[in-house]
Amino acid sequence: MTGNEIRSRFLKFFQDHGHTVVPSSALIPHNDPTLLFINAGMNQFKDVFLGREKRDYVRATSAQKCVRAGGKHNDLENVGQTARHHTFFEMLGNFSFGDYFKKEAIDHAWKFLTEEMGLPKDKLWVTVFREDDEAYDIWRDQQGIPEERLIRMGEKDNFWSMGDTGPCGPCSEILIDQGESMSCGDECGIGKCDCDRYLELWNLVFMQFNRDADGTMTPLPKPSIDTGMGLERITAVMQGVQSNYDCDLLRGIIAHVEELSGKRYGDNAEHDMSMRVIADHSRATAFLIADGVLPSNEGRGYVLRRIMRRAARHAKMLGFADPVLYRTATFVLQSMAEAYPEPAQRADYVAKIVKIEEERFIQTLDNGLRILTEEVERLKAANATVLPGDVAFKLYDTFGFPLDLTADILRGENVTIDEDGFEACMEEQRQKAREHWKGSGEEAISGIYRQLAEEGARTDFTGYGELTGQSEILAILLDGQPVSSAPAGAKVEIVTAATPFYGESGGQTGDCGTLAAGDAEVTITDTKKPLPELFVHVGEIAAGTLQTGETATLTVDRERRQATALNHTATHLLQAALVEVLGEHVKQAGSLVTPERLRFDFIHFSAMSAEELERVETLVNCRIRENAGVDTREMDHEQAVAEGATALFGEKYGDKVRVVRVGDISMELCGGTHANASGDIGLFKILQETGIAAGVRRIEAVTGAKALQVVRDQERTLDDLASLIKTDRPQLEARLRKLLERQKELEREIESLQGKLNADQAGDLLQQATEIDGISVVCGRVDNLDGKALRELADQVRDRLSSGVLILGSAHEGKAGLLVAVTKDLTKRLQAGALVKQLAAMVGGGGGGRPDLAQAGGSKPEQLDEALASVPQRISEALNAA
């Protein structure tokens, strides 16, 4: 039975038992800052379990993509070394939201394993929480598990909680006895060791309590079920193999690596490990990028980069000199297309991103490995086993070696890293990372918003059709804490039952305006949307006292809203134009829409040419002039996608979505505010196009009055330039070309004159030559010559000096310049680089070069004479030392 068949039969089994099959969510958690990646099947149902979200089903089943690499669940360093560790895996699960409980959950699991999968009952063992008599009795009496195979365990192994507070409950694990051959010895047993004889297959979590902050647990009115079973693990068991890497889900990727490398799996232990690493990391890489993560130096992108670079290093160990991971990542998506068709459609995009990252790392990998090898040899010579933290930091900062990659390489040399020293070097970067991922204060405020939502606060948005409205004030936050009233001058956050103010989301900034209630007047400077149905107005009380329970009049700043709406519609037109000009691979990777300007990030693999930018700008303006109507409506998500609506990479959408259509030009899923017609935008002007990450470009642009102002500023600049060179705007280009041609002519004349001057100066310098220990020495000061001019003069002197040493000094534009030249026959006795360093130190600078020619600069031209006066003594000392 293949892994694909097991996945299908699992979902079909639970569908036949009244469960709704829910597709896997993206690997990027939606609206959950506490989670780096989706790492369990229940993640996408978290708000349902917490009662914050209602679904139209009470039973669900899924096969969920998961990644564990970073944070609490970090399996990265073990991947490839063991039979079970993965960064990417699939979790099969069934869930009940207040519907069935232990009896049905246990029965479903037992029937699937013993009847659907045909596993022998006498090989299955079960653990329960030591105090969960109910589950124990169900297993024993309902399923007939003998007590010798029914084990009570403690809280560490068999009690699950979502956090320090909230839903929690006992769990029950189903294990399979794989036989004596898998035993670790006489002490082998459940709860006694971690070997694979008794292999955990399925964990059934019974959410039946709510834990308070003081630790008190009270029964939930509607207990729920959350179960999880690793697809790779059950597939390995069903296929009778002892390692997950030998099941067909991963063995096919390993076979592909065998084909590419020309090496056979099983012939060499080190090569086998590298193949396992590449197989696993290719899956994580492919699906993370397909879901919108890009390699970077922070957050999720840095975890992805660590995974990719570890895989690249193992590819090198297999003998690959050129990029190869882009090929294995493509193979992964194509081979898993039946289960995950959408990521497979992005295979070309994924391959390009992976190849770019691989090429960048390969350029520095050899240099980094050389430095690391030298350090290891030095440590061995000193009988030391700890790599200094600053060396590990240099490898990270200069050569892009993540710390765990360095540790991975050193493990085979029995060398560890001074992690405290590394952390000290990383302090500045760590501080930036903390700011990026938000501090505990912001997390606490986020908790306040959730608390308000749990207490029933929610906001209806009325701002699509109106810019004013009245509503009750539900909550006031002062310094992040709820208060019943706030005085004039206070900076507050206000939650109302309804609002016309748009809350920042989807890249569009929040509205500004005013709020009035009783005698209070509030200036609203921003509107946030921390939760899907909670709008928070940020502002300062200008007068009076604001109180909860009052009816407020809310008025949106019409001009700002209109400008923002125009920019948002222009962003949709821009995306459509980019697709038309650059190709279908263009996808939105982010955006920012403000009243002043718009910013659009998109997938593309090279800088846009001036011609491409002009075509895009022209196309957008053509569509503005078409004055196409902008239509918005709600529809089923599936229908919108079927009709061709564009969605944002990795974004989570509900069953109902809002679709914004601009004529026949653009159709996108979007919750933002828009113009009534494209003609309202007036004018579109691109300000700049830049690269922000591998395969991601950014365009910044303005519209309407702002665009007109940019054009006027450009015209004014042209007029000023024309006036400066005494012409008019129509003749500006021709006049500039003539000036540039004249400049080149003058430069050639100057160069010719300089050559003649150099010849004269060279003659004068040669006449001043002295002899030191039998060597001819020419030393002189020639001011107002830059570095290039000094070299040209030196060439003239050397051509006429058959054997000797030349030293030149020049004061130029407030700096000191030095040049030392030594004829080839003398370089074994006297080196130009050594002499110029000594002289440069006297003029407050430094420099160097070849044994026969070296230059230096300094900040103290007033010391030049003293430096040149020291030349005879320095040459004499150098000759005597030789």
From Swiss-Prot:
It is found in: Cytoplasm. Keywords: Aminoacyl-tRNA synthetase, ATP-binding, Cytoplasm, Ligase, Metal-binding, Nucleotide-binding, Protein biosynthesis, RNA-binding, tRNA-binding, Zinc. Binds 1 zinc ion per subunit. PROSITE patterns: AA_TRNA_LIGASE_II_ALA (PS50860). It comes from Syntrophotalea carbinolica (strain DSM 2380 / NBRC 103641 / GraBd1). It holds the Pfam family tRNA_SAD. This is Alanine--tRNA ligase. Zn(2+) binds at residues 568, 572, 670, 674.
